């Protein structure tokens, strides 16, 4: 009820609302009803979003996704939608990628990276709650994974440390231009030419912006 009231109030005040409807097994029966409500309320855009969550941290397919809260406790278990029209096509392509390259890791090692935030028409940066400047939410999101007792086991910290640690990429300490001067953005971009993740290619870039496997983009098709 609160969400509905807030959305209606936002639209009534002149807001341009967009509703991204994540489709899981438990919610796919309500897609048409939600789309009708969006029209009735004056939502500018209703997106049937085909989630790409059904890949684990090792890039293996899974049929369910266990949602957890910020303390790591299990919440609702999410399952793939049943209807093919609601499924993310990139997940279906995963078998083809594996046959071609041998494994998803072999694909990531060889993947051509086309950055989603440094393209010709789209340029953006991501500033974390700590005031740290990163290329995107995906690179920033690798900094603190709740399942690591030591967050610095993640590869992204190699680039952060090379830039002077957290202070080196802090907008509060250096300003945004100063963070760019630290070299972290160029170092990440240069890494895409390396032969493998083991040799220094930033893996999260290959996973999220590799040109042949893109669950993110397929969510919106």
List where the protein language model places each region:
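Radical SAM enzyme [4Fe-4S]-AdoMet core and its adjacent flexible, acidic
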Residues: 1-171
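Flexible mid-to-C-terminal extensions adjoining Fe-S/redox cofactors in radical SAM and related proteins
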Residues: 132-133, 137-221
């Amino acid at each position: 009820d609160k969400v509905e009231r807030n959305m209606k109030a936002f639209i009534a005040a002149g807001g341009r609302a967009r509703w991204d409807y994540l489709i899981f097994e438990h919610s796919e029966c309500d897609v048409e009803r939600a789309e009708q409500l969006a029209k009735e309320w004056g939502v500018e855009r209703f997106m049937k979003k085909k989630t790409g969550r059904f890949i684990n941290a090792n890039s293996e397919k899974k049929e369910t996704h266990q949602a957890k809260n910020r303390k790591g406790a299990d919440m609702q278990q999410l399952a793939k939608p049943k209807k093919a029209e609601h499924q993310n096509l990139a997940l279906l392509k995963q078998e083809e990628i594996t046959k071609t390259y041998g494994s998803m890791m072999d694909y990531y090692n060889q993947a051509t990276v086309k950055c989603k935030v440094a393209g010709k028409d789209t340029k953006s940066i991501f500033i974390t709650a700590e005031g740290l400047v990163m290329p995107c939410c995906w690179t920033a999101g690798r900094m603190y994974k709740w399942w690591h007792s030591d967050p610095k086991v993640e590869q992204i910290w190699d680039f952060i440390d090379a830039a002077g640690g957290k202070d080196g990429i802090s907008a509060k300490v250096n300003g945004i231009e100063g963070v760019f001067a630290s070299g972290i953005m160029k170092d990440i971009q240069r890494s895409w030419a390396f032969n493998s993740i083991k040799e220094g290619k930033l893996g999260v870039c290959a996973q999220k912006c590799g040109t042949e496997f893109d669950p993110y983009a397929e969510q919106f098709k």
